[in-house]
Amino acid sequence: MKRAILIIASILGFFSVLIGAMGAHYFSDYLVLVDRVNTFETAVRFQFYHTFFLFFLGLSYDFTNIKLLRYAFLVCVTGIILFSGSLYVLCLTNISFFGIITPFGGILLMFSWLIYLYSLMK
């Protein structure tokens, strides 16, 4: 599982850089037109921040509660998908419905940090 966490963190890190570059170069005119540049940058930034969090989870695997660490990992990945993913879709389609999903992803991201904290204290 440790290796899987680090691999998924690497993949998500790669995609955060790729998506950020696409937003800056390929989608920039459209994002300006629909006034979603800041929203897109927030999605990329949060994905990138939580990629590092996933690396910490993977590197913590040997000295913390493995069951809780797995929960933190799954909750974090789900949070990234819901938070950043919904913002990416919102920005690129300009369909406001996807904005409803974003807070649920944010809550999961916060919850993943709390699960990790609890795993360290246990």
Identify the residue ranges that each predicted region occupies.
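Polytopic transmembrane helical bundles with strong interfacial aromatic enrichment
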Residues: 1-122
